[in-house]
Regions:
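Short, small-residue-biased leader/transition segments that mark boundaries at the very start
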Residues: 2-6
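Active-site-adjacent substrate/metal-binding segments within catalytic domains
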Residues: 7-12
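Short, well-structured secondary-structure segments
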Residues: 16-41, 48-51, 56-61, 113, ...
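Catalytic domains of cell-wall/extracellular-matrix polysaccharide-remodeling enzymes
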Residues: 41, 52, 63-180
Length: 180
C-alpha cells in the first residue's frame, strides 16, 4: 500500500484556505494543517472550517519564527502561545529551524514533524510546472509533502497549478493519502 501525507503550512488565510479545503474535499483527502497562531487569531472562521472538515491541526508557532534567531525561552513561549488556541500534539518548526535545546524541550510536549518533500510553492523563482515536477520527481512511499496555504504560494499561481495536479498524479500512481 503506497501512502502519502499532504502537509499544509502557514495558514489559515481567507484568500487561500477555503480553496484548499474545497479541493481536498473534492478528492476525499484529509491533510494536516500546521497553522501559525497569529493567523488563527486573525482568521478564526477559516480555522474552524479546517477543523469542521476533519483535518488534523498542528502548531507552527505563533509568529512563524526561526528557532535559531530566538532564545530558548522566547521560542518555547511562542510555541506555547499557540497551545492556548489549538491544543495539538503536533509541532513543525518554521523553515525546519530550531536549536537542539529547543528540540529537546519540545519533543516532550509534541510529536515534531518535518518533511521529506517541500514543494517550494512559495518561491517566486519557481514556475508552477517546476513545483509540480518536484512532486513527480521526489515523492516516495511514506512521503510528507509540504504545500503552503499562504499568499506567497497563491499570488504566484504555484499552489493553484501544482496542488490539484499533484493530487491527480499521486492518485494515478496508486497513492492513498493519510493524516499524520
Amino acid at each position: 500500500q503506497r501512502q502519502m501525507c499532504i502537509r499544509d503550512s502557514d495558514g489559515p488565510i481567507p484568500e487561500v484556505t477555503p480553496w484548499v479545503l474545497e479541493l481536498l474535499e473534492k478528492h476525499n483527502i484529509k491533510a494536516t494543517f500546521f497553522m501559525v497562531g497569529d493567523n488563527i487569531k486573525k482568521h478564526p472562521d477559516e480555522y474552524r472550517m479546517v477543523v469542521e472538515h476533519g483535518h488534523r491541526i498542528g502548531n507552527h508557532t505563533f509568529n512563524h519564527i526561526r528557532g535559531f534567531e530566538y532564545s530558548n525561552p522566547d521560542y518555547l513561549a511562542n510555541a506555547q502561545k499557540v497551545d492556548e488556541i489549538i491544543h495539538s500534539d503536533l509541532f513543525r518548526p518554521p523553515h525546519g529551524h530550531m536549536g537542539f535545546r529547543q528540540y529537546y524541550t519540545l519533543r516532550y510536549h509534541y510529536r515534531i514533524i518535518m518533511w521529506d518533500l517541500v514543494t517550494r510553492d512559495y518561491s517566486k523563482r519557481m514556475r508552477p510546472e517546476q513545483v509540480l515536477n518536484n512532486v513527480k520527481r521526489y515523492a516516495r512511499n511514506g512521503s510528507i509533502i509540504t504545500f503552503h496555504d499562504s499568499l506567497k504560494s497563491w499570488n504566484n499561481g504555484n499552489l493553484q497549478y501544482a496542488l490539484p495536479r499533484s493530487i491527480e498524479f499521486l492518485k494515478a500512481e496508486g497513492y492513498e493519502f493519510k493524516v499524520l
